Amino acid sequence: MLLDHILKPRAVAVVGASTRPHTIGNDLLKRLLEYGFKGHIYPVNPKGGEIEGLRAYTSVNELPDGVDLAVIVVNAKFVLSTVDACAALGIKGLVVISAGFKETGGEGRQLEEALAAKVRANGMRMVGPNCLGVVNTNPNVRLDACFAESLPVAGDIGFVSQSGALGGGILNILKDLNVGFAQFISIGNQADVNAETALEYWENDPDVKQILLYMESIPDPANFRKLATRISKKKPIVALKAGRSAAGACLLYTSDAAD
């Protein structure tokens, strides 16, 4: 289905996994392990060896078949070649945590355009770049590929946020209130997957019974309105659109590249 490779993967590769504590590449790997992901986990680090008790593969090309999702945390200049390697292996789901794209302007914008084109050309789906990651609390999945401060308790809400900071803040607040989530998607620069993609996916996902959206830009307002009108007849939707003032829009552009 639309986002199954990302939200319900059977195997996850962490490209840019690290042995160094308190780095994103190490924290993400540990969170996958500690949350009890039900599938296989493959760290990728050019030095190889072992990371958090798992064999580290020196490149994506070394990975076994059957990887659904690659969580990419390498430097932005290496992301395109990493995506090429993922495509060659048949990996269809990508979460690009790495920053350094449209939010930096100029060359970063061009790099993101090339990234999005490569994803489309290979029939892949991508969350990000410049995002916190994704979570699925379903006990048969147990996916925590996210570096938000708080992990939501299990529930029936699907939550998508363009802002990493605000998304993480909402998770903190609602965790304190014991409000549970089924799935969380931090879309970041939304070069591919956006709020509309999430709405379409969650429309028929039995795990998600309520939908919460925080958006700073809507690429196709007419299509969003059409989707939201249709889906809200089945599941309640709460949507917050920020950045309405000129000052707010400027601030949002520098944080998550909202257009």
Set out the residue ranges of the language-model regions.
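Catalytic-core regions of core metabolic enzymes
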Residues: M1-S255
